């Protein structure tokens, strides 16, 4: 068997509770090694410019539509063309924000998209999962919901 070129920081399950401290919320994230980028549910996305900087405002929810909305405003990091799992291509806004997963802390890039018809409000893709090992047979290794 080939050895890993690095020592993994942690083993995570196929679903994990993650905290977005700047947003003041904890969400259940689906771990998706097939997705390159991570995504966060966002509604009512608006872009504005202030003192030469672009800002993005949006509403997100820690669960389904029945959970209270979180209003958030942050710097717009980028705008990227993303291909969804069904092959549909769309432009999405990208933000950078700290993320906590158990004792791990990292900066992640999140694309903003409407995930209200999805089971999980957040998807963690390969870029956020660098140096982590995924155990697909288990869930919530870093804390129960």
Locations of regions flagged by a protein language model:
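Pepsin/retropepsin-fold aspartyl endopeptidases
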Residues: 1-145
């Amino acid at each position: 068997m080939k050895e890993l070129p690095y020592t993994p920081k942690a083993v995570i399950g196929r679903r994990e509770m993650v905290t977005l401290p700047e947003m003041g919320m904890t969400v259940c994230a689906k771990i998706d090694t097939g997705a390159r980028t991570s995504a966060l549910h966002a509604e009512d996305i608006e872009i504005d410019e202030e003192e030469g900087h672009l800002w993005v405002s949006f509403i997100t929810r820690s669960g389904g539509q029945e959970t209270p909305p979180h209003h958030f405003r942050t710097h717009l990091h980028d705008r990227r063309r993303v291909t969804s799992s069904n092959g549909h291509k769309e432009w999405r806004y990208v933000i950078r924000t700290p993320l906590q997963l158990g004792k791990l802390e990292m900066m992640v890039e999140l694309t903003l998209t409407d995930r209200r018809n999805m089971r999980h409000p957040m998807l963690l893709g390969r870029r956020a999962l660098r140096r982590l090992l995924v155990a697909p047979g288990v869930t919530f290794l870093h804390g129960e919901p």
